[in-house]
Structures are given as structure tokens and as C-alpha cells.
């Protein structure tokens, strides 16, 4: 797959997107074991549980509107909330997709929160 970027795209973003494509070649979500995808912006963290076979999102959770905590603590709460919503839909096993980000900080905290909430990776 050939990627096209504008000349203003930062090298850091280009490298993350290349990593994302490499990871997505191996990480696929199914109906029995969907994919837990993480996205982090400058202020917020988003988590989705996706069935790639049907192409639909089963659960979506974010830190928008939850301003009482920030950073790592908020990411952990988002992970626990995603796990709670997933177990309500009888989802216990997921594949973790870090989306090209390093497994560190908010991404790791979200994964730990999801594990504490009852999801198995």
C-alpha cells in the first residue's frame, strides 16, 4: 500500500502511520474476538471495539466530557468503561490494537484499565 502525504505532514506522524499499517496486517478483529482500537489526541483518549469481518463498531468510549481527571488516570477510566460496555454485550476476549502508538503512558494505562474491567487480550 502506497501512502501519500502532503509536504507539511510531520515525520513523526508519517512514521506512526507506517507502523499502523504494519500492525494492521497482522491484527484483525473477528466476531468472536473483536479488535480494541486506541486513538489518542493531545487532550483526549478514544477506544473502540470493532468487528472487522462485518465492518461495524460494537463499543465506542472516549474521555470527552469527563474533565475531572486527565492523562493516565483518565485513560484508565476509559479502558474500564470500555470493558464494562463490552461485557454488557458478552465480549470477553479482544485483540489489542495500539494503532501505531508506543505501548507506554496513556495507551498502556487504557489497556490496564480494560484488563481490570474484565477483558482478556
UniProtKB/Swiss-Prot annotation:
<comment type="similarity">
    <text>Belongs to the universal ribosomal protein uL18 family.</text>
</comment>
<keyword id="KW-0694">RNA-binding</keyword>
<keyword id="KW-0689">Ribosomal protein</keyword>
<dbReference type="Pfam" id="PF00861">
    <property type="entry name" value="Ribosomal_L18p"/>
</dbReference>
<comment type="subunit">
    <text>Part of the 50S ribosomal subunit; part of the 5S rRNA/L5/L18/L25 subcomplex. Contacts the 5S and 23S rRNAs.</text>
</comment>
<dbReference type="GO" id="GO:0022625">
    <property type="term" value="C:cytosolic large ribosomal subunit"/>
</dbReference>
<dbReference type="InterPro" id="IPR004389">
    <property type="entry name" value="Ribosomal_uL18_bac-type"/>
</dbReference>
<keyword id="KW-0687">Ribonucleoprotein</keyword>
<dbReference type="GO" id="GO:0006412">
    <property type="term" value="P:translation"/>
</dbReference>
<dbReference type="GO" id="GO:0008097">
    <property type="term" value="F:5S rRNA binding"/>
</dbReference>
<comment type="function">
    <text>This is one of the proteins that bind and probably mediate the attachment of the 5S RNA into the large ribosomal subunit, where it forms part of the central protuberance.</text>
</comment>
<dbReference type="InterPro" id="IPR005484">
    <property type="entry name" value="Ribosomal_uL18_bac/euk"/>
</dbReference>
<keyword id="KW-0699">rRNA-binding</keyword>
<dbReference type="GO" id="GO:0003735">
    <property type="term" value="F:structural constituent of ribosome"/>
</dbReference>
<protein>
    <recommendedName>
        <fullName>Large ribosomal subunit protein uL18</fullName>
    </recommendedName>
</protein>
Amino acid at each position: 500500500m502506497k501512502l501519500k502525504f502532503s509536504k507539511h505532514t510531520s515525520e513523526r506522524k508519517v512514521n506512526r502511520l507506517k507502523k499502523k499499517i504494519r500492525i494492521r496486517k497482522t491484527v484483525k478483529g473477528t466476531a468472536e474476538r473483536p479488535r480494541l482500537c486506541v486513538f489518542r489526541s493531545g487532550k483526549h483518549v478514544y477506544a473502540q471495539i470493532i468487528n472487522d469481518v462485518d465492518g461495524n463498531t460494537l463499543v465506542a468510549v472516549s474521555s470527552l466530557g469527563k474533565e475531572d481527571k486527565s492523562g493516565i488516570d483518565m485513560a484508565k477510566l476509559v479502558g474500564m468503561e470500555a470493558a464494562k460496555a463490552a461485557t454488557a454485550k458478552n465480549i470477553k476476549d479482544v485483540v489489542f490494537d495500539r494503532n501505531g502508538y508506543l505501548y507506554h503512558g496513556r495507551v498502556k494505562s487504557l489497556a490496564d484499565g480494560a484488563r481490570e474491567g474484565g477483558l482478556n487480550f
